[in-house]
Amino acid sequence: MRTVKRYFKHLVLFPSIIATLQILSFVKQVLTSFASFVIQRKEPHVVRTPEERFRGLEAVGYTFKPNYVDLPVGGGRTLPRVHYVDEGPREAKETMLCLHGEPSWSFLYRYMIPGLVKAGYRVIAPDFIGFGKSDKFTFPEAYSHDLHTQTLRLLLDHLGVSGVTLVCQDWGGLIGLSVVKDSPHFFSRLVIMNTGLPAGTEFSIYNITRIMPFLLWRSFAELLGTSMPVYLLFKTALLNPHPAVLDGYNAPFPSPLYKAGAARWPLLVPITSHTPVAVDMQDTRNFLSKEWKRPVLIMFSDRDPITQGQDKTFQKLLPQAITKTITRAGHFLQEDKGEELSAHIISFINNRL
């Protein structure tokens, strides 16, 4: 009986909180628009995080040489520069493509890369535009699902890779698996971690209640906008955060001007099934269930409230998948159990799982 009472208490409380946050977000937008009109502030369309922000990260394991390529995306006169880690031999027997999500960057994979390289693999870990060492558009509206998928396809073309094992987490899964659908010739295996393929939902009390925690996070993100406290977000999300590690995650964002991409991503997650992203996610689900017959490894952690239960969705879509539960790890499981994840991937490729 107490459980039922708590359920209905939350059912009433969450919409009230979300409505309040939506009102505050609207007020903020009005004030911001008015201030911009009065001040007539001109901001650059593309900014680049100063290199000194990344100094000292070798001390916490980010020791990789930077690689850059200018890609024709975004529709502006300035081509954004995309950063990627590229470690291991170019003629390696396998290539790993490691994709980060919100609001992280290739720094997230620093504990996984050495083990994979030592095993003889090539490891590529890009920073999506708006994150890490890649250039950043200063307006949230410049970011879209299509921007990120197009960027990834162009990067793969630039690198000339094939037979790739996709390693993806969070938004890296939404972007990466969409590209698998559209360009399957690049890929030979999938490693899916703490992500989902949200195709929106039809309105019902059950569905709205089920996604209420995400709606609360989305409303907070919309209210905070480019004031999102990345340092505090990781301090809350990581299980045992060290200040130097938190500095590493916060390094790409010296001011709100650099956070437009991080502010935008939560708002691109589809809530209803009729948005373009929702349609693409449903198409991706259909592709995986009907056409993807190659090997799959699913690794979800036991302490991630954000993607809890999504591993079951992938198991239904991909019945050939091997599934591993990573214990004592949160949403950013690469940070908590990076070396263990690498060991599982190596065993998976060598058919030892």
Question: What does each model-found stretch correspond to?
Answer:
Residues 83, 100, 331:
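Histidine-centered active-site/metal-ligand motif
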Residues 102-113:
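The serine-hydrolase catalytic nucleophile loop
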Residues 98-101, 125:
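Structural cue for short, hydrophobic secondary-structure segments
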Residues 2-67, 71-73, 82-90, 95, ...:
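Flexible "cap/lid" subdomain of the alpha/beta-hydrolase fold that forms the substrate-access gate
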Residues 329-342:
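Catalytic histidine-centered segment of alpha/beta-hydrolase-like enzymes
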